[in-house]
Swiss-Prot record:
Belongs to the transposase 5 family. SUPFAM superfamilies: Homeodomain-like. Residues 2-135 bind DNA. InterPro entries: Homeodomain-like_sf, RNaseH_sf, Tc1-like_DDE_dom, Tc3_transposase_DNA-bd_dom, Tnp_Tc3-like_HTH, Transposase_5, WH-like_DNA-bd_sf. Binds specifically to the terminal nucleotides of the TC3 inverted repeat. Its expression results in frequent excision and transposition of endogenous TC3 elements. TC3 transposase acts by making double strand breaks at the ends of TC3 element. The excised element would then be inserted into a target sequence. Homodimer or homotetramer. The keyword DNA-binding applies. GO terms for cellular component: nucleus. Gene3D superfamilies: Homeodomain-like, Ribonuclease H-like superfamily/Ribonuclease H, Winged helix-like DNA-binding domain superfamily/Winged helix DNA-binding domain. Keywords: DNA integration, DNA recombination, DNA-binding, Nucleus, Transposable element. It comes from Caenorhabditis elegans. This is Transposable element Tc3 transposase.
Amino acid sequence: MPRGSALSDTERAQLDVMKLLNVSLHEMSRKISRSRHCIREYLKDPVSYGTSKRAPRRKALSVRDERNVIRAASNSCKTARDIRNELQLSASKRTILNVIKRSGVIVRQKLRPAPLLSADHKLKRLEFAKNNMGTNWSKVVFSDEKKFNLDGPDGCRYYWRDLRKEPMVFSRRNFGGGTVMVWGAFTEKKKLEIQFVSSKMNSTDYQNVLELELSKYLRHYSRKDFRFQQDNATIHVSNSTRDYFKLKKINLLDWPARSPDLNPIENLWGILVRIVYAQNKTYPTVASLKQGILDAWKSIPDNQLKSLVRSMEDRLIEIIRTQGNPINY
């Protein structure tokens, strides 16, 4: 039980007078609304009352326990309960959280998605970066597919980020089952029209999308001046799709596998998602979601496209610096 406040000078003076008048302890307690124990302690030694220091409150965790808590939380997805049980501590979950917060080096952070990379993937990414340092990125059409859900973007994943360490990542498969799939593309100066596609799109479907939008766009430019960027999804690199590119004389950018962090359209998708789901908006029907996507796509200003494309050189530098490992873009 917490201790009450010390008697004030006025209360002490009242007690001194009441003691001279032989007022009972019970009556003193009633008159000044203080406990009999408090009054008794004062009357026992009025001179030294209030001069002794209270013993400091015992800490729930020792210094060693706190170090173990920080070590257990470091770059992990453990909850405060998990950490408490793992270390067999009697402290509350709030105490565990306070220790982590006071550490100054661990914060709650969302897991950053990144592909699983083999040594060969990293080597190909590194080679791509070195070979394309002089590429004119304003002449590249960047493309990708994106999934949207009626009830908002995919769930967030958070963990205890140790600021002294590299951020953790999580890996996920493409096309895990959504409600609306779109194909999009853009250049430094222009967004191509969004195309709604099937999540089970095959090579022929993909070629139809390219014919409908990419070929229409390239008709206004010299094809030899432009290169088309796509990832290495099966329908993108199938024999029939390769034949289509040859027939249409569309030059391809030799893109390294598992490299969404290199593609600025991933950042454009992020901008689009924030607009589509602004203020935690959800959509009752597929039709309303599609309209929301179209409206959001049109609202993105062209000056943002230029800054995204111009980030390519910085991305390549980061790939070289990290020797092909995932980069934070």
